[in-house]
Each structure stands twice: as C-alpha cells, then as structure tokens.
Amino acid sequence: LMYLLVYFSTALVIACTGTMLMGALAWAGLFTYSIILAAMLQISGHLFFDTWYEGSYGILAAVRDLGSPLMVIVSFMDKYSSGNYGKQLLILIFVLLLMAVLSWMAFCRRKSENTGKALVYTWMEPVLSALITIPSGLGIGLIFYMIPEDSSKTAWWIFGMILGTILVHGVLEVIYEMDFRRFFRRKVQLMIFGGVVAICALTMKIDLLGYDRYFPAYDNLQGVVVNVCNLSYTEQLCNVEKKENGIYKIRYTATSDNSSGLLDQPVMKSKALYNSLKDIRLQNEKGKKSGRRMYVRYINKQGFSVCRSYSVSSAQAQNLMEALYDEQTWKEDRYSFFQLDKQYLKEVTGIFCDGDIHSLFEKNAEKRQALAEALRKDILENGGQTVKDQPCAMLMFDYAGIPSEGYMDEWGMNVPAVQEGERVSTSVLVYPAYKRTLAILEETGYPLSMDELSVEYIDVYYFSSEAAGEDDEAFSDTEPLSDLEETENGYKVRYDKKEQLEALKKCIRPSQLVNGWTIWNADVTMEVVLEGQESTGGDSGLYMTFAGEIPDFIRADAKAAHVTCLLYTSPS
C-alpha cells in the first residue's frame, strides 16, 4: 500500500508537469510541503503568541500528518508499531485511492499541445503560486525577524517578507515560462499576494484573532485537562491502567512538546480550578509572565478542544495545585501506579530531612506494602490544603516484573513490551497531613522535621552577581551583619549561633523536599553540618535550599555579598 501511494503520487506529478525541472520540484513539494508549512506555523506561534501551545493537535496536526503522502506513510508506520493502526490504515487507503483517481484523471485529460510547458494545466499556475509564495514570504520574514536581538527586529521582518515574496514569486514565473525576462510578468498577482502576506503578518503581530485572549465561559465548558509536569517535577510518576487479562498499560508523564500530555489525562470541572486558570490567563494577558510553563486543554460542550500554554508564578501555581489536589479524579490518575499488584513492589527508599537516602523495610515485604497503601489512602483522603505545607519526606517505590503491553515514554513514543516484564520507579512527596504514612515512617527513626536535626553550624555560600561591581550604588552603603569570608566565586558565612540556626531551620529544606512550584534562589548554597560531622569545604555534603521566609540577617549578608537574586516567593 505504501509503495502504491508513492507510485500514484509520482504518476500524478508526471501527468501534471511537462518539464523535468518542474516535475522534480513538484514531486519534492508534494511530499514535503505540509511538513515545512506546519513547522513554519509552529515557529510563528512561538514567536508571536505568549500562550502558544507547542504540541500538535487539531488543524495543525491535520496539516502535518495528512497534508502529504510522506506524512501519511510515517503516521501509519508509527501507529503500526504500537498495534493500534486501524484509523491510519483507512486514511492510507483513502489517500491511495484519491491519488490513483487524480493521476488517472490528470493523464486522461492531459492535452498534447501543453506537454512542453512547465505545467500541463495552466490553471494550476496561480494556485501553486499562491500556495508557495505566501508561506515563503512569511517564512523568509521569520528568518530575518529572528536574526537581530534589538528593536530593529520589526524592520528586518518587514524587509524579509517583501524580499521573500518578490523573490519566490519571480522565480516561479521564470520556471513557468523558462525565461528570466518573465520575472515580473504578473505584477497585479504579486501585489495581491503581498497584501495577503501583510494581512497574515499583521494578524499575528497584534493578535487580531484574539489567540492570547481566549478563555471559555464556565457555562460553555465541558471540562479542562491540565498538564503540570513542569510545576511538580520533584515527583516522578507514571499512569497505570490494568487490563482485564492482568496486563498493564503504562504511560509516563508527557513532556511539554507532545500533545499526549493533554490527551490522556482526566477531564475536570470545578469553580476553584476555573478561577485559578482565569487568574493565570489574566496575568499572562497583562504581560506579568514569570515562573514556569503549564499546559491546558479546554473542552467546550460541543466537544471541540483548545490548548494553551501559560507562564505561572509561584503563588498562582500554589493556588492551582490546591485546586487540583481537591479533584479526586486527578489524584486517582496522577497516582494510579498504586494500582500495581503488591507482588511487584520490590524496594522502597526514602529521603528525609537529613538529606540522605535510606532503604526502608528491606526484609519486610508486608511493611513495604502497608506503607504504599497508607500513602495511597492519605493522598486520596486529603485535599488541597495539604500542599500548603512543605514536604517532610520523599518515598521512592521500585516495581519490577510487571506484565505489560509496553509503555508510552515521557516523549509520547510507544516502547514495546519486554519478556521479563517492565520496571517502574516512582517518587512521591510526603506531607505533614499524611498521618498514616508518618506513623509508619516514625518507626524508622529517620528525621521527619528540621527540628529533629542537631545542627552544629551552617555554611552559606553567596555567589556574587557578575553585574554587581564594588561601586554599584545598590551595594555601596550595605554593611554585612556577619563576617564575610571571600571565596573563588563569592563569599562564605558560617552561622553557628543558636538563634541563627533556629531561624534557618524554619526556612530551609533538602532540595528534594521542596514543592516543585516553589521558586528558590540559585545564587545561594547552604551546607548544613550536623553535630559530630566535619565540613567538606563546599565540595559535597548536606545541602539545603530556601523553602520559607528568609531571615533578615541572611538578606543583609546577601546584599553585602552582592547577591542580586536572593529570592523566595511565598505561595501564600
């Protein structure tokens, strides 16, 4: 079937063209046009729309996957490898029959007196010119738009569009007539195409269609799907679905550039979630864009889907995560790996407030299973208020020998099953509200709060900003509250007073035990030295990060050390 599709596509090109040059160009265009057009639309959306979703869906997916025989073949091969190719097979057969009919009609109606022309059917000339000139003008303009980094981008963009439109249109006219003197043969047509290019460019530049302003009314909304993989990256999870025959279907959390991250997750609808998304959209519209990206699929009552991508601040992410943790279906899907039979759970490890990794209940399988079950119940029974607190531990569950039909990796690619069964590794944060889980973890004796650590001193390393000089007005009259010891990359301060240690213990955590949506500072590193230990001199050891309100003495020393990015954004 694939061979026949290529054959009839080639026959169609031969029947419609009269020269080798035009035939070769038309054949290449038939097989690659939709790919290039889809890529150009993606780049345009990324450059001009703040809420552009880079995944492939809807019209864009249809253009890319169905717009050329090559992509029809590629899509069929991709689905064939996963065993779910019925729909793609029907599309392949339909396109094959379409190409066969068109090539037969083109051959039968081909006039012998036109065989020496570039195109046998002259009515194709303006159609091909429009299909090639307009996207080419926009595409060449994009290339010029991306080159400069200053305010001249718009001027270069306009120049590139004018140049591209004139050049491509003229080259096509030369190819049609095989005469360089025909470069400006159709001036009116060129002006019309130039006007269309200008309208398309203006539409993108000032968002005439309201792409970034889109937000559905609550009453017209069937539900939303939210992908927060960039916000809660601390946890490593996968979706598990048990089939009737005992075989599992496994899907890892999809990344931002694959539409499966919004297709296979639960549909939700609640006022709290809606209001949280509305606030995020309004802040993006006002230009207040900071933090990480999140992805949303809105489904209206007619069944149509619209996807968007938003920048989310720490406070907005906190409100969003609270709303999501109130959604039972979302939690059941997010933590569905707990559906795996207990026999496949081989190991449980944990990270506690001392920052170390400990293996738990190595010789007690029943205890490991009880711990997993306790955590599952705690997650499902506790709501959004749970994630207002910082985690006190992280548990990692390792499963092996799982009978599976294969799995979908984080890039949305299908990986075939292996005979010995799949391995699944997950990590889940434990919050203070998870009473059942904490009761079991207390038996281990590992610290579940910073208060349980006996800290001798804390070395804080301040990495000075390169932009801040000794004469910078922002730092000129700042006096440190502590002794700054100069290091290769900045300064170090040792805090060993009781009140300092108590204040720091309230606002620091091992980096693994910080909510993924909490913003902390990368210009400060803290090495915590417990009683009886020795400092490693900053090369390795127990490192912490800010996860609470930063004390005034830290802020003062950071400013004196020329640290310009001392930041913790409170989610409250």
Regions found by a protein language model. Give the residues of each.
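Hydrophobic alpha-helical transmembrane segments of polytopic membrane proteins
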Residues: 2-18
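Alpha-helical transmembrane segments and their helix-start/interface "positive-inside/aromatic belt" motifs
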Residues: 18-29
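Membrane-embedded alpha-helical segments of integral membrane proteins
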Residues: 109, 122-176
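Internal/C-terminal transmembrane anchor helices
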Residues: 132-136, 175-211
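Short, structured surface segments that line ligand/substrate-binding pockets
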Residues: 282-314, 381-417, 515-546
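Conserved small/polar residues in nucleotide/adenosyl-binding loops
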Residues: 568-572
